[in-house]
């Protein structure tokens, strides 16, 4: 808002900038309304009882037992005050045979200890177990509801990062709010009520006077809770935004690396962290202020009580024991009310976190895959009709896709949809799958409106194979099995056979059990597609939707898959979306779509009769390129070319669905792993990892010393020192309070005149203590909040920086997937804060309490002090054992939940695939399986913690009994006086209170150790190929000569599959080299190696004769411009995406001219917001062709010396393809260019064509030379194209 006051402050400025002011004000207005909306969002919470909406009867039983335990445990202290009053009178009134009387009271203490032990056990284990169970249920319900949402929800309301963030972060907050904290709150409440009941029974008059301070207490407490809740949700919002940055960056790490975008990602992330830091500090300061006020009120009410109590002893005949019983009962009662604040803040945070989650859980989508309503027929014929359909994508309501679109497809026929990129072809597929409903008009199957069918059933009759196949992080077998519930291995094998996948599957070390990696990154595009086809075959659908299904395959697999598809297309209604006209020739009907209208339809031969028709023009466009070749070849080429026309376009769902926000991350997420189309993979990756885990758990890489973590807080040392001083002051307050109490006890048994003077004096001292605490508390929490929040910010920032600079191979490991790392950054950093800041405060406070306690005790009576001290180790041992137990569990639980969140991450990222295969239940089963382990651990932890917790109370009360008994003996023997006994007792019990508080922190500190280990594992790992390293050579003038000498290479994640052995290739400056070969032969791996995503295992790669390892990495990557098969765009404006190529510093004119060069300017200007159009998560708001053009503009803007085109034009329709190819031809001039392609037209004109097979280059030369080698590999590849096309 500063900018606003700046504008309105100075009238001269106003006149000068009236124009800009108006714009700014408009912006401000927009910001304000956005801000208001956000604020509105921030403060929404659910009512507390609603947190338990998902409890079952067993949970209720546990919660009832827990509640009874909490009440019993809470009454322990008030009952103790009763015994305590008896003790004081026993000591104070009898100067002889004290021991007798005292021992009777001491025995009661022991019984009280036993009762409290049982109650505390019930309390903690009841609440911890029910909390764990309910949180698990909420997690799975949330995922279940997310999976049932309609696709529009994913386009508009959420993204993968947010879902995983909520599942890992918010459920922790919710669990915190309904687990042991509820028990603690009930316990404190019981103490409060019990204390006051006892006080009233013993002496109502004094109690009433003390009660006058309660309204003040309550007000202070309430204020505290409100402030905490407000600031907590503000911080969460900022962290959620930061989590999205992590997800985007890691999900597209190859793009980030290639465009040296690490700095940008880091500064973007840090921006969100700063906001969260500020919120955290405010939260800390306000908490302290609230606590300080509470203590001030408490101590002042003491002062009042002491003074008034003295009066009552003189006037009303109260005894000293009675007065103290009342004071302490009221004190424990009200103190316990003050201690509820951490519980209240946990409740508030949980309620805020639950709001968004529960809102989602209750959301009923318009298109509901779980709904059992709707028709279920015996079978369908498969007539499809779109009738007068009007449609816009929900995420882009102002761009009309269809206006009155109609199309009829009769059952058993094949209809092909052709047209330019973005014309709405794939939208037809989305509507038939019922991913969306049209705004007007109907989609009918067999004459019945699609909306009338039961969604799950109708989807089970429709098979979808799309352009970007989405696989799940599971084995190949599991992936195929998505096609059919409980498919047998035989059926799966048969489907793989039909889809021509069994050849490459059999070659893999684990066969069908090979893991495919996150989003199938361990397979090449062609391999992924064949598995997707097998999955559709297994489903045996009535209606088959092929959205560019064979585009990602090389000629050989394409031919066989096409055959497989032809086989399964028989007697099915088939809708084919294709750019490549060869794919569509044999269709029964071809419909040409242009700008959301059907402009022509008919069979191939019919449509060709009209030479001016749209179809003929499309054909002509595809054939123009070949006019320079002789007629025969032209004939052949047209077919190949068109055949390969989109050959690499990896996917369609994404693309054109993407037109409307589709494929939310489906593929593009990892697209670049396509780089090596590595043919095999390693199932080992995942399995081995599990085996390792038994020997050296990955979750606890190595123990991290607390000093190392503390070192991260070094810059805050001054703040920490101030905080520690305040904490020490806070620690001394309680023991001093003990001295005051014992002095008051003595005063109560003095002669009247002395009694009057003494009570007035001590009352004033109590008030002084109160004012000390209103200074010390806020100081402590404020300073520690600064240090703690800075630490969280620093850890997140350092870790993220480290992660972004890791070599690309690191991200191929399953435990470094974007979901897991996102969860690590968000949860672990916060947990570590507990270890340094918050528990340091607690530790300093406890130490100073203990030291002060000991000094006071030894000065009062050293014999008794030793006896009481002998008891303290018992209390400490109990605390220590408790810590040990807690430690055992949290490590595994963390890894297990990490695996579960990967399942969620996968499913949400591929929501269209999950929906079209009705795989929601399957995903849920996988998820619950992964959650079973952590669940059991949580329960075990609850039981063990309960025992530890109960035992500490038993020890506490027994040691009280022992110390008073010994004190009585000492008084009888004349070794000490009764007020000294109380001084020792109070000093040490206040210290013990401090100890028991610190053991209550233990769940946090044991989690923090594991978190620290996992964070430092990242920080300590040196990136093998680190772009942030500034050393290395920089060449002044890059010519662009590239040479690969004797290169051997295996992907680090798949050490058993050799990609290259002894590969040699030299590329002269300014020349264009095309790499061809089958899918999985390693063509894209060359590009990955040139950008140093990986380093070869042996051999070397040079640029202008200099080995690239010796060059500065960042500089090297700036010399290369990469345009790849699945372009990854960031969820920013088009302008920002293009500028990304130049590190975000490109000028407007550079951006526009690169867009013009890449033929993107035209469509961008046509968009409502032009260059300021947001492209959506992973660019889903643009069609594939549009995304690709933006990606080319991004590569061109950095003016690279070496251009790497990995199937760059494959996703475009003929027209854009031609123009982009022109653009590429223009920018290829004087640049060394490496082209990876399946399509012949793209590579024919290359200066050199290199054919890669079995990891070596088997042929190279110009097209004309290679085509004439008899039985040559190239010639046979070309021949394949021709036969496939004809």
Curated annotation (Swiss-Prot):
Superkingdom of origin: Eukaryota
InterPro entries reported for this sequence: AAA+_ATPase, ABC1_TM_dom, ABC1_TM_sf, ABC_transporter-like_ATP-bd, ABC_transporter-like_CS, P-loop_NTPase, Type_1_exporter
Domain ABC transmembrane type-1: 63-349, 720-1007
Tissue specificity of this protein: Mostly expressed in roots, especially in the root elongation zone and lateral roots. In mature portion of the root, expressed in the epidermis and cortex. In the root elongation zone, confined to epidermis. In root tips, present in the root cap, S3 columella and epidermal cells.
Residue ranges of every copy of the ABC transporter domain listed in the record: 384-620, 1042-1279
Function: Auxin influx transporter that mediates the transport of auxin in roots. Contributes to the basipetal transport in hypocotyls and root tips by establishing an auxin uptake sink in the root cap. Confers sensitivity to 1-N-naphthylphthalamic acid (NPA). Regulates the root elongation, the initiation of lateral roots and the development of root hairs. Can transport IAA, indole-3-propionic acid, NPA syringic acid, vanillic acid and some auxin metabolites, but not 2,4-D and 1-naphthaleneacetic acid.
Protein's UniProt name: ABC transporter B family member 4
């Amino acid at each position: 808002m500063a900018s606003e006051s700046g504008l309105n402050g100075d009238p001269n400025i106003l006149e000068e900038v009236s124009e800009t002011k108006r714009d700014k004000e408009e912006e401000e207005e927009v910001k304000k309304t956005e801000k208001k909306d956000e604020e509105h969002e921030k403060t929404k919470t659910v009512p507390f009882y609603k947190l338990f909406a998902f409890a079952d009867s067993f949970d209720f039983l546990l919660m009832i037992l827990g509640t009874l335990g909490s009440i019993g445990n809470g009454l322990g202290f008030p009952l103790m005050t009763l015994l305590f009053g008896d003790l004081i009178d026993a000591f104070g009134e009898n100067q002889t045979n004290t021991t007798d009387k005292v021992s009777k009271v001491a025995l009661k203490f022991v019984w009280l200890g036993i009762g409290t032990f049982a109650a505390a056990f019930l309390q903690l284990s009841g609440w911890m177990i029910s909390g764990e169970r309910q949180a698990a249920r909420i997690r799975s319900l949330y995922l279940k509801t997310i999976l049932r949402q309609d696709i529009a929800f994913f386009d508009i309301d959420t993204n993968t990062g947010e879902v995983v963030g909520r599942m890992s972060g918010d459920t922790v907050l919710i669990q915190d709010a309904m687990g042991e904290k509820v028990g603690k709150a009930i316990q404190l409440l019981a103490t409060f009520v019990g204390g006051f009941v006892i006080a009233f029974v013993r002496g109502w008059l004094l109690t009433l006077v003390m009660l006058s301070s309660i309204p003040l207490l309550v007000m202070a407490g309430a204020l505290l809770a409100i402030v905490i809740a407000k600031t907590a949700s503000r911080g969460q919002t900022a962290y959620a935004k930061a989590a999205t940055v992590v997800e985007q960056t890691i999900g597209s790490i190859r793009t980030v690396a290639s465009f040296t975008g690490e700095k940008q990602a880091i500064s973007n992330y840090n921006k969100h962290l700063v906001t969260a830091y500020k919120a955290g500090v405010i939260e800390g300061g306000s908490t302290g202020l609230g606590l300080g006020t509470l203590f001030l009120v408490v101590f002042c009410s003491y002062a009042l009580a002491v003074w008034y109590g003295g009066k009552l002893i003189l006037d009303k005949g109260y005894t000293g024991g009675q007065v103290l019983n009342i004071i302490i009962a009221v004190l424990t009662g009200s103190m316990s009310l003050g201690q509820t604040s951490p519980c209240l803040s946990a409740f508030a945070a949980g309620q805020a976190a639950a709001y968004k989650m529960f809102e989602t859980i209750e959301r009923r989508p318009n298109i509901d895959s779980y709904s059992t309503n709707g028709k279920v027929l015996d079978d369908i014929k498969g007539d499809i009709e779109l009738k007068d359909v009007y449609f816009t994508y929900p995420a882009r309501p102002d761009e009309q896709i269809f206006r009155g679109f109609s199309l009829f497809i009769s059952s058993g026929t094949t209809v092909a949809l052709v047209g330019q990129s973005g014309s709405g072809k794939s939208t037809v597929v989305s509507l038939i799958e019922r991913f969306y409903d049209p705004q007007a008009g109907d989609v009918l199957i067999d004459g019945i409106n699609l909306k009338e069918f039961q969604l799950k059933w109708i989807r089970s009759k429709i098979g979808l194979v799309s352009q970007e196949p989405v696989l799940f992080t599971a084995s190949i077998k599991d992936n195929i099995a998505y096609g059919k519930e409980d498919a047998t291995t035989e059926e799966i094998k048969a489907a793989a056979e039909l889809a021509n996948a069994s050849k490459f599957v059999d070659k893999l070390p684990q066969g069908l059990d090979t893991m495919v990696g996150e989003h199938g990154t361990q397979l090449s595009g062609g391999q992924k597609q064949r598995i997707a086809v097998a999955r559709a075959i297994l489903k045996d659908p009535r209606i088959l939707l092929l959205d560019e299904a064979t585009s990602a395959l090389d000629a050989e697999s394409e031919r066989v898959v096409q055959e497989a598809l032809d086989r399964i297309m028989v007697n099915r209604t088939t809708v084919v979306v294709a750019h490549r006209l060869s794919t569509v020739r044999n269709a029964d009907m071809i419909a040409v779509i242009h700008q959301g209208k059907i402009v022509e339809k008919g069979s191939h031969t019919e449509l060709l009769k009209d030479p001016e028709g749209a179809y003929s023009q499309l054909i002509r466009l595809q054939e123009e390129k070949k006019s320079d070749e002789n007629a025969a070849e032209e004939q052949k080429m047209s077919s190949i070319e068109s055949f390969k026309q989109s050959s690499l376009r990896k996917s369609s769902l994404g693309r054109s669905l993407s037109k409307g926000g589709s494929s939310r991350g489906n593929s593009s997420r990892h697209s670049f792993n396509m780089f090596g189309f590595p043919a095999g993979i390693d199932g080992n990756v995942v399995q081995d990892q599990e085996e390792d885990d038994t020997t050296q758990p990955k979750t606890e890489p190595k123990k991290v010393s607390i000093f190392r973590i503390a070192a991260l807080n070094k810059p805050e040392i001054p703040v920490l020192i101030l905080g520690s001083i305040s904490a020490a002051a806070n620690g001394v307050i309680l023991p001093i309070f003990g001295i005051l109490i014992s002095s008051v006890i003595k005063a109560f048994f003095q002669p009247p005149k002395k009694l009057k003077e003494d009570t007035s004096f001590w009352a004033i001292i109590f008030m002084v203590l109160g004012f000390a605490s209103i200074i010390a508390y806020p100081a402590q929490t404020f300073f520690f909040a600064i240090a703690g929040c800075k630490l969280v910010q620093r850890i997140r920032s350092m870790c993220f920086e480290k992660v972004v600079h890791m070599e690309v191979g690191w991200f191929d490991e399953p435990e470094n997937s974007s979901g897991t790392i996102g969860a690590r950054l968000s949860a672990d950093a916060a947990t570590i804060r507990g270890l340094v800041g918050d528990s340091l405060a607690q530790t300093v406070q406890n130490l100073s309490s203990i030291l002060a306690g000991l000094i006071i005790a030894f000065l009062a009576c050293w014999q008794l002090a030793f006896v009481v001290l002998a008891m303290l180790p018992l209390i400490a041992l109990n605390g220590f054992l408790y810590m040990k137990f807690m430690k055992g569990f949290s490590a595994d639980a963390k890894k297990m939940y990490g695996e579960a969140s990967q399942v969620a991450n996968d499913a949400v990222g591929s929501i269209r695939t999950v929906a079209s295969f009705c795989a929601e239940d399957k995903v849920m089963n996988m998820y619950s399986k992964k959650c079973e382990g952590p669940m059991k651990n949580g329960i075990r932890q609850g039981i063990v913690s309960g025992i530890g917790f109960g035992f500490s109370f038993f020890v506490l009360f027994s040691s009280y009994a022992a110390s008073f008994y010994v004190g009585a003996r000492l008084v009888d023997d004349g070794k000490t006086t009764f007020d000294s006994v109380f001084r020792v007792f109070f000093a040490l019990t206040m210290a013990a209170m401090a100890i028991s508080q610190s053991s209550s922190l233990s769940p946090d500190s044991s989690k923090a150790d594991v978190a620290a280990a996992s964070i430092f594992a990242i920080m300590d790992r040196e990136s093998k190929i680190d772009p942030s390293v500034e050393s290395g050579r920089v060449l002044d003038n890059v010519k662009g000569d590239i040479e690969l000498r004797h290169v051997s290479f295996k992907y680090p994640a798949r050490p058993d599959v050799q990609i290259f052995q002894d590969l040699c290739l030299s590329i002269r400056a300014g020349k264009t080299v095309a790499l061809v070969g089958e899918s999985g032969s390693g063509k894209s791996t060359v590009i990955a190696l040139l950008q140093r995503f990986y380093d070869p295992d042996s051999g070397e790669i040079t640029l202008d004769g200099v080995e690239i390892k010796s060059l500065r990495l960042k500089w090297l990557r700036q010399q290369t411009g990469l345009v790849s098969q699945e372009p990854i765009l960031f969820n920013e404006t088009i302008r920002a995406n293009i500028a990304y190529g130049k590190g975000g510093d490109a000028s407007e004119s550079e951006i526009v001219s690169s867009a013009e060069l890449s033929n993107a300017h035209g469509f961008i200007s046509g968009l409502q917001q032009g260059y300021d159009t947001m492209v959506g998560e992973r660019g889903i708001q643009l069609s594939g062709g549009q995304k690709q053009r933006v990606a080319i503009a991004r590569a061109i803007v950095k003016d690279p010396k070496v251009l790497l085109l990995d199937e760059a034009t494959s996703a475009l329709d003929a027209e854009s393809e031609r123009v982009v190819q022109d653009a590429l031809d223009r920018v290829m001039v004087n640049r060394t260019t490496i082209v990876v392609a399946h399509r012949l037209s793209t590579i024919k004109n290359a200066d050199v064509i290199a054919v890669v097979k079995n990891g070596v280059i088997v042929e190279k030369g110009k097209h004309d030379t290679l085509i004439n080698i008899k039985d040559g590999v190239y010639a046979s590849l070309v021949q394949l194209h021709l036969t496939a096309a004809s």
